[in-house]
Amino acid sequence: MNMIEALLSMRVLFLTQVFGIFLCFPGLTKAGHLHYHSSIEVVIPMKVTEKTRGMNLPNWISYSLKLGGQRYIIHMKIKNLFLTRHLPVFTYSDQDSLLEDYPFVQDDCYYQGYVEGDSESLVSLSSCFGGFHGLLEINNIVYEIMPKKFSRKFEHLVYKVDINKTESRGSSLMQDNITCQVELQKSGNPILKQSSFEDWWTHTKIVELVVVVDKTLYDHYGNYTVMLSDLYSVINIVDTIYEVIGIKILLVGVEVWNKKNLIVIDDVSKSLRLYCRWKASNFLHRLKHDVSHLFIYRHLRGLSGIGSTGGICDPKRSCAVVTFIDRTLNLRAIGVAHHLGHNLGMKHDEDICKCSYSKCIMHMDSPPIPKFSNCSYNYFWSYTVKNTRCLMENMYTKDIFDRTRCGNGVVEDKEQCDCGSLRNCTNDLCCMSNCTLSTGSSCAFGLCCKNCQFLPSGTLCRKRDNICDLPEWCNGTSHECPDDAYVEDGIPCGVSAYCYEKQCNDRNEHCRQIFGQNAKTASVHCYREINTKGDRFGHCGLQGPTYIKCKSNDALCGRIQCDNVVQIPNMKDHSTIHFALVKNVSCWGTDYHTGTSLTDIGDVKDGTECEQNHICINRHCVHISTLDSNCTPAFCNYRGICNNKHHCHCNFHWDPPNCMIRGHGGSVDSGLPPKTNKKKHFFYLLLLQLIILACLLSCLLWLLFNIKGSKRKPQVQPTPVKTKKVSKKVPSQKPSPVPSPSLPQLRMPSRSASPTSSIKSTN
């Protein structure tokens, strides 16, 4: 066997906006061991007892403290809307049994507020351990405050964050910057200012967050109570940061890996992939949530973490991994907020992105800045507001807060709706300020609610995304669209492709995505030769730092191998293209650097066919029967297709649940499509017949008119024309035979005949 290998390395600058929001690449940021604190002051917060201007509201407290020679008045109120009622905490026993507990959570020691005289200020503090700990932003200066240990005078240490140590580098491409600014301003979703951001929608969006603490972070704390308190403080700061853009962060559960890590945590991308997979198969069914973050205490090659971009409403991608090592409480919170921004569809800031600082929270350097840039607002508007249906649904989850209150923007017990503040309620035609529907209104929100009324039954509320997806329709009696349903795993979607997790994975299409439209999957010899080597170009996964060799039966489930590559693609972020010649067959593939932020495009996707009636799952070629299901084509009477909930989605003309009775299609999960109006169809059919009949009558009348007209015309006899006889002497000769005009002249084959002559004359 001849083998020729060529490594083609292409190094390019990683651009976070190459592929767009809907490709959902993970986002990474640099963490480093940066010392942001430039100065320390000792302050004593003094409680203000007199009611200052505008502070006559109940449940508000005020403190005065002196920073940098200037005294500031801080107004705060207790925050009680970021922890669920009866917060569950999961741990493990010595026998690896799952334990569920509901520890006491002190919920009256978390505050949010502002600094008097600074409308852009931000205050997020906690006082659960006898002093204030948290974040202050005053006049575009960020501080971290914490109690001074063993102080009897209520002294606190205030650290001023040195932002200059993270100054962004200037760009010489001024024209490109101007062009990009113009493009952003011309976009359909213009960049909006923070001051008017709250007016974009009526209701607040809620992100239900689950936090998992790995073994290293648990061991670092040692004290279980202090660890949970710090977690709550971090989420408190994150919630305060996101409240500016109309998002509430709700912590709905915590899991602590107190015995051992349940996944392998070595490189960044692999850890994220494994954690997302673990979360989807374990935690998702245990506790409903929108996004889950894994907090660890170890270095990630200079990164603060990694999060799946735009995965907020995808249960298999709504996750992130964040490191807490060598980071203060504020930096931990800002790191969580950064990667949550990726989950919400925000990309890394570029040089054109601006806020009140030189770098903003979504910058790749992960600066200690709690402000979003104009670009982040634009991404949030163009993606999150318009594409995150799950957040709209979670807004109205019942019984999730410690205290119910009309006016908090969340529909709770005994509330028909909640339009939030009085200002918002004046602009809401469906909901009144007392959390009841306005007169004549049937609903106030939801995908099946329009103009305060339920959409009619059969109205499409969620269209079909691809061949492996299924549509959903409103039922006419609810404001909610049915849960997203899709084609059952294992159902064929092509010649050699199967639906799996809502995607139709085909090898040829996979190669075209990497190497262009002419590419196709390579010979099986390429897979068996390369993927059984166990190197970075061919393997079946990683076990620590070692590549796993694919077994011969699993070779087609390792890394993708392609043929018929016409042009080498422009790979990103130091990716390498691999070429080999196996049995005179070209084999093209890629490697993957685990420290990059790009998705590994070279892995064979789960659900890809590897043999007849076999598919790849977790890099193993398994029989399709392993996808156990009670739903079969026979169960649906061969008149429908099974969905992911193992119910029949019937074809048109047949009704669920088993597609036996005549109807209009759909399923018990997705609702029923609109019914066909037989009277309307009959009318259209009758109209078509009348049009055809009218055309025939018109043609008949035209023929009759022409026939009568020809009979009425008089017969005119032609006048004979006198002609002179012309005599000409012609030498006598035998006349040539003239062919009959009624017979066709055939060209007869003749060996001596001229090519241009078909009849021969004789004298």
From Swiss-Prot:
Residue ranges, compositional bias (Polar residues): 751-763
Q: Which residues cross the membrane?
A: 685-705
GO BP, one annotated term: proteolysis
The residues the entry assigns to the signal sequence are 1-31
The record's listing under CDD domains reads: ZnMc_adamalysin_II_like (cd04269)
Q: Which residues form the propeptide?
A: 32-200
Q: Which domain of life is it from?
A: Eukaryota
Those parts of the protein on the Extracellular side are: 201-684
Residue intervals of the Peptidase M12B domain: 205-396
Q: How does it sit in the membrane?
A: Single-pass type I membrane protein
Which SMART domains does the UniProt entry name for this protein?
A: ACR, DISIN
> What Gene Ontology terms describe where this protein resides (cellular component)?
external side of plasma membrane; sperm head plasma membrane
Q: Which Gene3D superfamilies match?
A: Collagenase (Catalytic Domain), Disintegrin domain
Reported function: May be involved in spermatogenesis and fertilization. Seems to be a non catalytic metalloprotease-like protein.
Query: Know the name of this protein?
Result: Disintegrin and metalloproteinase domain-containing protein 29
